[in-house]
Amino acid sequence: MENDKRTLVAGSTGSLGLNILKLLSQKGTPVRALIRSEDEKSKVTPYTDDVWIGDASKGVDDIENLTEGITTVISALGKSVSLFSPSEESFFETDYLANKAILDDAVKNGVKRFVYVSIKGADVEKDYSIAKAHKMFENELRASGLEYTILRPVGFFSGLNDLAILAKRKVIPVIGDGMAKTNSIHHEDLAAVVVSYHENGPDIIEVGGPLIHTRLEMAEMIKDKIGGQIVKIPETMAKIGAAIPKIFDEGMHDKLDYFAFITTNDMIGEKNGSISFNEYLSTLDLNELP
């Protein structure tokens, strides 16, 4: 296939990936979408008819020559950190092995550039499973010889949907004193940042949204929108609570452990976008939340 500066989008059926796909399509960029099943095809066909079906977490053989004819790979591929999104795959399988398989195929096929959406906290010293999987892939990407940009978003607004779901159940947990600050970002705004680095950009950038709030302020916004009671949970109790699921469900433990970390430490990145958390909350359809 002749190289026509085609871009591969991995993780193309998630909220971030779909917006990346949409923006690239609007720019007239030829795009290939990687999806995992035929059932997902209708999500991406409004933006491209170049669709590959494969599960990168199964290794290179399942996606062999996926990147043939590709100039740039954009990967928004990763496991959901939501407590209400169970998945059989581990963070190691989804965030590391799947991206590594795509990277190996990209190197083999002479891809020029790789843009990867990681997470803020990937470089923390403590051995969080979620952060570790991203960090392992970041290291692989750095050593690959490809041009790259690694984006570390501080968090998505949609990542706080768990609190909205709990608010429907009349409780909004806040770990610690709630004074840790963050400037989480809307997935549409983050997609625009990702696409802006499509052809070139910094090696690593930490990306946030337009406004900085404390965790308590965000909980109060959720309460104003949905109702519920804000309940402060001491950090020590949260750590004990996160450890208990490890006996039964390693993935749930990983999510709770990392949630406690990010909500008790400042998670602030370079300001981008225009959509506020209050605006995001106003668009939530509570009937669609479990």
Segments from the language model and where they lie:
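Glycine/proline-rich active-site loop of Rossmann-fold NAD(P)-dependent oxidoreductases
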Residues: S158-I165, S196-I205
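Amphipathic terminal alpha-helices
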Residues: T263-P290
